[in-house]
Structures are given as C-alpha cells and as structure tokens.
Amino acid sequence: MKLIYGVKDKPKFGQLIIFSLQQLLAIMTATLVVPVIIGNGMSSAAALFGAGVGTIVYLLFTLFRSPVFLGSSFAFIGSMSAAFAGGVSMSLGYLGLIIGAVFAGLVYVVIAIVVKLVGVKWINKLMPPVVIGPTVAVIGLSLASNATGDAVSGGLKNAAGASVCSPLIALICAIVTLLTVIICSTYGKKMAKLIPFVIGIGAGYLCATVFTVIGNLADVDALKVINFGVFSSLLDNGKVALSTFFAVPDFTFLTALGGFKELSPAYIGTLAVAYIPVAFVVFAEHIADHENISAIIEANLLENPGLHRTLLGDGVGSMVGAIFGGCPNTTYGESIGCVAITRNASVYSILGAAIGAIIISFLTPFVAFVNSIPSCVMGGVCMALYGFIAVSGLKMLSGIDLGENRNLFVVSTILVAGIGGLSVSFGKIT
C-alpha cells in the first residue's frame, strides 16, 4: 500500500492535531463503552486515561515503529465481571481488576521471553497466512452486527433503554456519515483523504442535529437522534462552573487501595482462572493485528521491532492501563483500519492520540460531546472500519491455493466458527 505518511514521518503540527483527533474518535466510543457495560461505578474517563497511558507504554516498547492505538478490550468483559462477582466488597472488586490485568499481562511477558529466546519461526508455523488471513477477516466480520445495529439506533433512549428515534432516520444519518467517508477517501484532495473520519463524523453529527432540532420543535420523538442531555453534566445547580469543565477521573487504584485487607488466596485463584485463559485467546488476536498492520505499512513488525517487543508493549501497557482505568488494553482494529483507509501510518499521530486521550479524560465537555455522538453516526464509521479489517484478512489469502483441501478446510472452519460465534463457557468465563 502506498502511504501518504510513513511510520516515522512527522506531519505539520496543525495537521498532527487533526490526525490525532481522528484516531481518537475512531477508538473512543469502544474504549468508553466497556466500563459502562461492566458498571459498578467504573469511570469511562479513567478508562480513556488508561488507554492513553497504555498506548504510550506500547509505543516505548516497540521503539515507535508500530502505529496502532491500544484501547479497552472487550474480550475481558466476562473476566472483569467475575472480578466484581467474586469480591466481597467494591474495593476488592476494583483491586481484582488490577490483579487480573497483571495476570493477563504476565502471560504476554512470558510468551515474549520465549519468543526472544527461540525466535518467531514457531509462530509462523503455528499461525501461517492460511490461519492468520481468515482470523483477521473474522475480527472484522464478527463486528459487522455491531456496526449495522448501531446504524439504525439513535443516541436518545427511553426508560427501557431502546432508541426513541425512527430506525429509518438513524439509518439516514449513518448513510450520510458512510458516504462522506467514502467520498473523502476516494475523491477528496490530500487533506480530505487524510481525515475522512473526522469529516464523516462531522457530517453525520450535523445531519443528526438537524433531525433532533426539528424533532424537539415539533415534539416528534421519531426525529430525536441526539441525546443533548449528556451536556447537563456541565452545569452545577443550573450554573456553569469551572469544576464542571475539569474533573479528575475516578482512577481504579484509588478505590482498589481499600481492598488489600480483604484479599484472599481463593480470590486470587478466581482471578487467575478468569483472566489467564482469555489472555491466550487475545494473544492470537495480537498476532493477527500485527500481521495486518505489517502488511499495511509493508514492514514485518514481528521481526522489527520484534514480536517480543510488541507483546511486552501490549502486556505491560495493559497492566499500566488497568491500574488507572481497570480495563486491560488491546490493539484496536479500528485504529488499524483508520491507518489503512487514510494511508497515514505516522506513529506521531498515535502518540498525539494517546496524549490527547490523557488530556481529554480530565475535560468534561469533550467527554460529554463524545458521549453525545449518536450510535448511528459511529455505526456509519464502523461499517467502513470493520469492513476494511475483513477485507485485509481476505487479501492475505491471495497467495494461498484454496484448491488444496487442506487449506480449504482450515479457512472454511475458521470463518464459520468465527462468524457463527462459536464459544465455550467454563462457569462465568467464556
């Protein structure tokens, strides 16, 4: 792929801010939603802070050669729920989040040591292109239902948690967003091609705003796409105050400190069982993601800086991120898709996004704005991002002879099992 900005290229400062914002918008919704799913008072702002810090740790370990952002991992949602379920208090549950993330991170550290000692040839034999290709495709295709579901859902919910706006109106906003991204990426001039998602989200948000304003004026719920109520957090007793614009996130370690006196060997064992098996599953995704980004930037990241460094960056980054936000981190397909579609692989954009995530986590207005972006707008964006991830995986199969039964069965089994959602549960762990 011909890149506009290579990994080590540094855009001008003004452009860098916009490119970093684009990366941030691409990953932010998913990063913020994991704490919401877990509940128990977890802070989305703290998770965003943890993702930013974790990404910087990852960049340091990979010598700033791998342009990908780390965000909250959905794979550990069951593990995180088990941490709270097994804790006798909220403080112990929060401490469990950190200990569990350390267990998961140590899996990566151990594998990294093995890779450093014996090399990566065994990885290539264990996971050749005929395995990696469909695995990458499954990562994108398994997210397809999320994108299409979001595309017909608005941001304003009723008491039952259902979207109040018409699915057709939401779909119009999603299509406006998607078409804007496609037009900018395909026909736009240089700058437009570099920031199609910023422009697309802006166009979709504007469309949703128009519908919502009309809906509010005419009192028609079917047109109310955006939930402007999230901006009420900027008011303190009906007045604007400095404290409503700046707030320190509720970091996980602050609550976790009170859990040490309740810690028991049995609970630690529960955490080990909940987190360690999932870490091995996410390890396969780690390989697939780095094979994918390697193909995009035309540089083998498993050799330079090396798989041991990417694993250490991901593992230690997850540990550090969980200390602040409670969520183990992982390389984000949305970030990789953003790099590929915009052809901007500058690692400085990733660094800028990480720093931006840290700063923004303290700024209530920006967090409120991101929370106000309706699902349909992000659904339009994700249709492009997830689709590109799937296509990237299929492209890896271009040199594979699918006329050979051995290859055909490997690819078909992975695709059907992955897209079909095959899963095995052990207690509360899936």
Model-derived features with residue positions:
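Interfacial segments of multi-pass membrane proteins
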Residues: 81-87, 185, 335-350, 356-361
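C-terminal ends of transmembrane helices
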Residues: 4, 54-66, 109-123, 179-190, ...
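Membrane-embedded helical hairpins/re-entrant loop segments and their flanking transmembrane helices
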Residues: 8-13, 37-57, 274-347
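Membrane-interfacial loop-to-helix junctions in multi-pass transporters
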Residues: 45-46, 129-131, 168-172, 263-271, ...
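Flexible hinge motifs at transmembrane-helix junctions and intramembrane kinks/re-entrant loops
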Residues: 40-43, 166, 179-253, 273-288, ...
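Hydrophobic, small-residue-rich membrane helices and short re-entrant helix-turn-helix hairpins
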Residues: 187-202, 253-275, 288-312
